[in-house]
């Protein structure tokens, strides 16, 4: 055959499919490099194909005589497309039609053939693209991963990700052996995981082996080939399966074939890890090992020569595969990671831009359609409009007014058409003239009565219509003076309110365009602006409707002005930043370095860094604060816009409440988006997130996030993001940058990206982009086109990939539940389920299966039931139509309660009845409808959170009445109880919350039930006229909180759990409203009201069971008010202060009734060695003491009693024994003494003035005696350090309830001191004790440092200094001893003691105003400065105190000077110390002879302290600051700090056998374990495991279970032989390790729950044990908490309280120390804050892991800076050492109180799952 000279024969071969009947077949031709295809020929039977072939292969064998052959090709110009493109079809007829020529020369590296043939001989002609083939030899560059469905040339695929994402494709076809030649399209995507009808995956099949080798005839290249085999199932199961194969293959060829090329590219990079796996995979699947030599062939190709290999080895022959994948194999595939970072937004399709007017949209639609598309509606409207304009050029009578009324309806279609077609005719100008005449009062007055009002109203409506005609319309109106015209109308006399409202509507339309707003705000020369005129109008005596309408316009103006101001600040920032000198960057880095290396000074460094940033950018803190306020204002205005910025309908009346009436009519958001667009708001936000000075500011981040989050909640907001797609792409990149940074550092960023908002926003916009593609696909495609179109499948596949991680899943659920988005999937399903398509064809369509899965995911994960209201009927109809589809049947179960349901108040009884009937099926596959029923009930009966300016809708009150009458309360309590009973068992065994679906269902049910209960109880108890004594509610809530919200300290509650905790707290707090103020309060009524009963339940639950300790304490802490004073930037009104104080008194009263329980709690936990519980106890004690004096005395008495009992428990004659219990009690007392209320209660009790409390004064003296003689035992040393720290708190006058303030009438200094310091007798003994400690050579370094700092506190005022001098007279050698010790032990580590001691001496020498803090600023200014001191010690007296007989102080100072000088060579920090030494030495040298201390001083007499009750009543309730101090705002309590404790000290011998016989004699361990581990917990979408499986064959659930996700709890038995996703996925497999045993050597990956280790499999195989679904077998204890969390402990958004706060500005997490080994060690050395691998399965399909519970080991010391209670602690004088030297690694530095004393931050242990 003649072949064109430019062409060569690329391929010639015969595909055979011997089969009894004719059916559709698919074959693949793969070229080893890129080729251009010019022609494809089908060789008829008997025709010689090629002259140079041997006879036995030279002739065509094609049969039958005619058939249609479809061809698809891999488009190499779109490397990222997930599907093959269609090449075309050949209607083959052996007599007439055998040649197919593509329309253009196609370059490709693979073809797919499909047709109803049994045998096909095919020749392909074309040319080789040498260049490209050369390129392909080297691996492609690694840019970002999976692209958006529209192929974008700019986006290349990241090989690292391409694979795993594809690997799982739909339902995740298993990681199959990839033949490197002719490719087999894998099977239909989301197959239904029907048990009875598993969809076969045509992965590969029996290749017809064609006779001898064929290498002799290939011309230039030899594409290896392999006919696509049929799986056994196909031929066995007849027609339906074949159709399914055909249908599946058809789109699969579309969807999947190219994927395999990507895998191949990856193979090149995976270095020899594959061959063995594939070989094993084959054998292990129990298939025949037919082709050993093939595998050898594989071994020879190494990754770097892959591209060339095929060209060189023309004889190379590929093995064929006949692998049948079972459901089990599918489930064992490691999860694919979906990397969203590559997907960029593209211009908006289908939907229109949210800020464009209807007129603008119509114009752009006409332009797009082009002039040829005749639009009859537009033509008619334009003709009519032209007629009207021509007809009434002069006439201004009744007909003209009628014409004016008709015009608005013609403008959109008619005027737009005229403007496009007939540009010369000035219709718009004429309309503007008419409008101005219609608004003219003079013209109106000439009209007959009634007609004149019609004319004015028609004029205002015409203004609104023309204002919508884009810039042209508004500009025309403005030039004609429309604003003045409208104001004339508004200011005119005798104009009715309704006409004024019309005028306001017109004005509103004008300012809704930015040009109009500019004109309105500016005004013309020498004329008031529209804004000023409007204010004047409102200030006149107007009706309420007119004022409301005017206010709405003012609100819009304010919004516009705020945006203008933000833009101004943004431009200013941009200019300053661009003009910055370059050197600012390196400075920043050095700071950061300093911060890392020296954790002790972290706070200072951070502050200096911020200052450097501020200075370098010339941006003042004030400007940043202003920016934050403006952003917050934007958020507030947008939130309230629907109630404050819309023009009310003329007939409505603004009232406080309404019961009926239309919903809000107007939508303010398009206008606001227009303003945002015109101010380039998204670009500004991106700028703020990119400039270091603003992006590092938590306030800016939080404010921007609030605005963005608000926008992303609505469809229009998302469309706004998409219409500004370029800015959005940059914005998301900037946000993700923070997310990455935080992961890098192992930190949780400050609340901005804490909830993966960046990913959620990205996934939401991507989802909507996919929806726009679906809609535009339906617009373009007609029904006659083939069903599974490649673009359509690409889009659906992308959507499906997004659902693979929890953030993406929630984003998909959210976006599909908005407006009509779900219709896109329903349309698809309705199209495929049409009978016209033929039953089997539609059911096997891939797109249909995708749509089923996606709709199911949306219904499961979205709580927004508005979409169900619209679509439930059509969805139920689809479920009914296809009864064989498991996905749809499951969907039917979810939608069951919606049959014939109207979403109105009347449906409440039916839904509650449904809940009652199904309560026993809770959390089972049959009971999923319960979740839907509860969601609908929430929607119908629970009001949305109130927004300022909103009318109260009384229909919600009616709904609550319905709930009560339908026995809702009882039903919901039963739901909670049932939920608790189901969750308790797995929770006790530390099992995670199950799969994503199980978790979503649990959280959703809990949230809905809690919301309903909250609504009912709030309504019931609000007035105080009802009492509610059903204690099942608090009891169920306490249990639920324990199960869902108690987590180990490294963890944080995620946003869902946080919301559940908030709901639980809110419900419990509603019980505090049920107190009738009018009742007289007696002991009895107090004990029996709802508040007390709720408290009793909560308090008794704390000690009920050990598992509830921690949760109970958190719950109590969350319920109690925060300690005062509040920090604020505004003065708080006296009324609000009294409310705050009264609330605390009420709490105190009700708690006092439960005094015994409170004491029991404090006593029980005081001795705990479990640090989290110790920490929570301290926190609760502080909160209780802060309420009022009775609770403060109660708690402090209890603590002091414990110390008394502990110290007196030893017999009298022996020396007192100090145990570790003593240290814990003193540590508790020390922690409490640093808080105001607790300290004053302690002082009150140890004064010894109250009858019956004398024992406390005695015990205090015992403690002072202990400090004087520390002894050498470690425990005594610890006790001494705690006692000195307690003394320091008692002597700090800043720890006081009444703070000195600069306001008039504030108390005098002496009164202040009398109320905050110990009395005269105590002060004397304390000073004696301090000096004795200094003189004692046994005192520890920390102890000395604390004592010196305490003396510095005392030296600030005459009262303290007087007592110090008195003690110095008694103990004159103390200062000398200390100086000597400082000199003799001086080193870099003890420099702090030397420095403090010198500072103290300088302080007592000096009688001027003391600024002992060095840098007395910050809060000091707020708190009020300390007044001057008159007393002092002169230099001669000091010289006397410092000398002894042996040596003079000058010599000691000289020696110290030498030492300091020597050390300062290495350490610059000692320079200032050197100056102090020299200065003091000179003062002493010049002072002359030493003199004894004078005793001439007058003793300052303090007034008697006020009673504790008075102090509480007059306490400082708030602290005013210029700028919010973020540390104080977010954290009132030191975050949990780990201390290293010598655990051996706390070991107690216990006889467990004896204990078990005594306490649990009837407990049968064997049966309990059997019950726990062999019973199957039910959960949605689970099937029971079959017992006694055969290896490799036991039934496992399919890869996508009922939820569309795999349960991944029970690992498949053969997981260790499945090849891993190549070169990507879970942390680099197969890199230099034995390829077939990756599981034994892998690191732990905490992005998913722990799966079984390979050794467990071996054990399981030998024992035939089935690990149960749901509860992992009790293997090694789980080592680390899998809850992916980050730093800072528990979050809390109730005023920054959670159990340990999310705000972590000053709390660095424990660093993870290297990698955790999977198998060694106990539960990890610390609860390290772990990094969430970005976006990939942190809650994994395999079930999100909850957190570990159980005994909590001591944590490693963390590096951080704690919160210091005293304002002056910020300054250098610091607090005493955190205390115990034994608790700190480097206690030499004596860090401040609450510091985490050891540092070290390192990368967390995750290998990053994604690379950017």
From Swiss-Prot:
Phosphoserine PTM positions read: 133, 138, 173, 222, 1579
Record's compositionally biased regions (Pro residues): 139-152, 174-190
Compartments reported by the entry: Nucleus speckle; Nucleus, Nucleoplasm; Cytoplasm
Q: Which residues carry this modification: Phosphotyrosine?
A: 914
Gene Ontology CC annotation, any one = RNA N6-methyladenosine methyltransferase complex
Region of interest: Disordered: 132-302, 576-596, 1616-1635, 1663-1812
Question: Is Amino-acid biosynthesis set as a keyword in this record?
Answer: no
What's a single GO MF annotation on this record? RNA binding
The annotated regions of Acidic residues compositional bias extend over 234-266, 274-302
Q: In terms of one coarse class, where is the protein primarily found?
A: nucleus
Biased segments, Polar residues type: 224-233, 1723-1748
Q: Which residues does this entry mark as bearing Asymmetric dimethylarginine?
A: 1741, 1773, 1775, 1793
Please list the residue ranges that the record marks as compositionally biased, kind Gly residues.
1689-1698, 1788-1802
Record-level GO BP terms = mRNA processing; RNA splicing
Query: Phosphoprotein: present as a keyword of the record?
Result: yes
Residues bearing N-acetylalanine are 2
Q: A single Pfam family, by name?
A: VIR_N
Phosphothreonine modified-residue sites: 184, 1708
Q: How does it assemble?
A: Component of the WMM complex, a N6-methyltransferase complex composed of a catalytic subcomplex, named MAC, and of an associated subcomplex, named MACOM. The MAC subcomplex is composed of METTL3 and METTL14. The MACOM subcomplex is composed of WTAP, ZC3H13, CBLL1/HAKAI, VIRMA, and, in some cases of RBM15 (RBM15 or RBM15B). Interacts with WTAP. Also a component of a MACOM-like complex, named WTAP complex, composed of WTAP, ZC3H13, CBLL1, VIRMA, RBM15, BCLAF1 and THRAP3. Interacts with NUDT21 and CPSF6.
Q: What function does this protein fulfil?
A: Associated component of the WMM complex, a complex that mediates N6-methyladenosine (m6A) methylation of RNAs, a modification that plays a role in the efficiency of mRNA splicing and RNA processing. Acts as a key regulator of m6A methylation by promoting m6A methylation of mRNAs in the 3'-UTR near the stop codon: recruits the catalytic core components METTL3 and METTL14, thereby guiding m6A methylation at specific sites.
To which protein family does this belong?
A: Belongs to the vir family.
Name used for this protein in its record: Protein virilizer homolog
User: Where does this protein come from, organism-wise?
Assistant: Homo sapiens (Human)
